[in-house]
Amino acid sequence: MSAEKISISLPKELYRELEDFITRKGIPDRSKIFQIALRNYLDENREGTEIIYGIINLVYDHEEASEALTEIQHEYKDNIISTLHLHVNERLCIEAIAVKGEKSKLVELNNRLGQIRGILKARLLISFPYEKT
């Protein structure tokens, strides 16, 4: 793998947190942490029309949200690949929705889901396909 060396400055407290994290987790390669963090940041802020993949993580009260949630999922059936549903307790559920499509469409879906009454959390984690470098 071809790589460029760069230098960064961190506030002392952030640097100490990083070093503590590396020590606790036994991570041998500090560069890998920055590569992953930078890819995540760039993915979150990238614009474009290419097809991307992602997971929408929902936490919700099923008594309030189930009907509207199902309705919206049917509207976006071309973008939803699969869902995983977990029961937390008698009322709360967690749902992980695997999605595929243009970023703008997935953000729109996440925003619509987040507006449903009873949705406590709606978070989109996106991933652009990368060639291995």
Curated annotation (Swiss-Prot):
Give me the disulphide-bonded residues: none
Top-rank lineage group of the source organism = Archaea
One of its GO biological process terms is: response to nickel cation
**GO MF terms on file?**
DNA binding; DNA-binding transcription factor activity; nickel cation binding
Question: Is the keyword Transcription regulation in the record?
Answer: yes
Keywords, comma-separated and alphabetical: DNA-binding, Metal-binding, Nickel, Transcription, Transcription regulation
UniProt cross-references to Pfam families, sorted A to Z: NikR_C, RHH_1
Q: Where does Ni(2+) bind?
A: 74, 85, 87, 93
**Cofactor binding, note field:** Binds 1 nickel ion per subunit.
Q: Needs which cofactor?
A: Ni(2+)
Q: Which family, according to the similarity comment?
A: Belongs to the transcriptional regulatory CopG/NikR family.
Q: What is the role of the protein in this entry?
A: Transcriptional regulator.
HAMAP family for this protein: NikR (MF_00476)
* The protein, known as: Putative nickel-responsive regulator
